[in-house]
Amino acid sequence: MYSGICIYMFLAMLSTSSSGQQATGSHNENPVATELEQSLTEHHRHVRVPSSAGQLKPIQRLDGNVDQKANIGALLAKYLQQARKGPTGRISMMGNRVQNIDPTHRINDRDYMGWMDFGRRSAEEYEYSS
């Protein structure tokens, strides 16, 4: 309990100190940081400026979206084909294992084949001969 409180306090101090450094760091005249901020704001301004080239960008985006939609459609079709074929891989191996269990096995009447629900077994108080 004490260690949990110490860890919580340490994380709280760490987060407050890092947020304090970010606030003071923006007021410092760091030439690299201010140059980076200016270049980013100029980049955003250039992107948002409407022009004839800016009008062509949505058309290119639509073409990209069409390609993405086609790819997603193809993946969905593959998935549906595999789902219709039935389970494959590890799931099918587990299914085969469940079918191969001996009918006289003592956990045959459980809901989950292959593992025991211990709470249910103890609640029902089955007596097995060992």
From Swiss-Prot:
This protein's name: Cholecystokinin
SMART domains: GASTRIN
Family statement drawn from the similarity comment of this UniProt entry: Belongs to the gastrin/cholecystokinin family.
Expressing tissues: Expressed in brain, duodenum and small intestine.
Known function: This peptide hormone induces gall bladder contraction and the release of pancreatic enzymes in the gut. Its function in the brain is not clear.
GO molecular function: neuropeptide hormone activity
Subcellular localization: Secreted
Highest rank taxon of the organism: Eukaryota
Chain positions with Phenylalanine amide modification: F118
Stretch forming the signal peptide: 1-20
PTM remark: The precursor is cleaved by proteases to produce a number of active cholecystokinins.
Note: Turtle brain contains CCK-octapeptide (CCK8) and CCK7, whereas the gut contains intact CCK33, CCK40 and CCK58.
Gene Ontology CC, one term: extracellular space
Alphabetically ordered keywords of this record: Amidation, Cleavage on pair of basic residues, Hormone, Secreted, Signal, Sulfation
Propeptide residue range(s): 21-60, 122-130
GO terms (BP aspect): digestion
Sulfotyrosine modifications at: Y112, Y126, Y128
Main location: secreted
A family per Pfam: Gastrin
